Amino acid sequence: MYAWVLDHSPGEYRYGEVPDPPVGPRDVRVRVVASALNRMDLWLARGMPKPPVLPVVPGCDAAGVVAAVGEEVSRWAVGDEVVVNPSLACGHCPECLAGRSVYCASWAILGEHRSGTHAESVVIGEANVVSRPTGRTWEESASYGLCGLTAYRMLRRAHLSAGETLLVTGVGGGVASAALAIGLQMGATVYATSRHEAKRERAVALGAVAAFPSGEPLPVKVDVVVDSSGEPTWASSLGALKKGGRLAVCGGTGGGRVELSLPKLWFGQYELIGSTMGTFSEFDELTRLVASGLSVAVDSAFQLAGYPEALARLRAGQQFGKLVLRH
């Protein structure tokens, strides 16, 4: 099959022929119809992190059609339309059996620890696909996986409730765009920040009460902050919390080292929550939300051959929502 491949890390992606991965007894082969980009695509090429196995096919997210099934697979058949869950786990350890797959010692991410979705097809365990949400486009179906799952778990772990206030920093990125939509779906009053005026305007058009320039003192105090930027927004995120507020962090795209005043933490009665990806049951719940009409922000779509152009747009931070490859 043909795929985008990274032979060295750091390195450059190339498009070429790679062997078809074998289908194990409990695997399915999915013919990819659409795949979505994530920051992981950029990080792998920079060697941050360095993939454990090279060469590797990038791509965490995809939607497609089942093309083959393993001999022990009973829940899927050739022709089924599915979405790929990029959160990998063993499925049989105590944590997995208890529904806490994100704590599995073998937990991994598709497209980082094993070859991913920017290819003609991807082979994945039968538990890692769900039925494609009815009424959603292929592009939308490919776009909610990694970032949507991360945002959903963050808001659940922060116990966001209807009527509470939520601040989403760096709106326009994949996690932030998903958090905006999910927060609104959960009945919260949502605020956002961005460096870009156009993104602030888009956030308000999508339902945010207000959007403010990143890095400036915020005129509101909120119950929950969702932050995926790290160092550049850390101080303002903490400063935006009400007494007893919760700060959920999933990334450090702008820097991974921050300073924390412990007296501020305890006198503010704040909760700090580290979170990434989600469990299989949370992916099922998110998929049901998407099927019921949850907004999925798709910035633009490219042909598979246009992966370099899509990467350039992602690198420049020009997008609002997800960048998608049509296969």
Ranges and model annotations:
Residues R31, L88-G170:
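NAD(P)H dinucleotide-binding glycine-rich loop of Rossmann-like/cofactor-binding domains
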Residues T189-Y191, E197-E271:
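Glycine-rich cofactor phosphate-binding loops and adjacent beta1-alpha1 units
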Residues K243-A248, E259-S300:
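Rossmann-fold dehydrogenase core element
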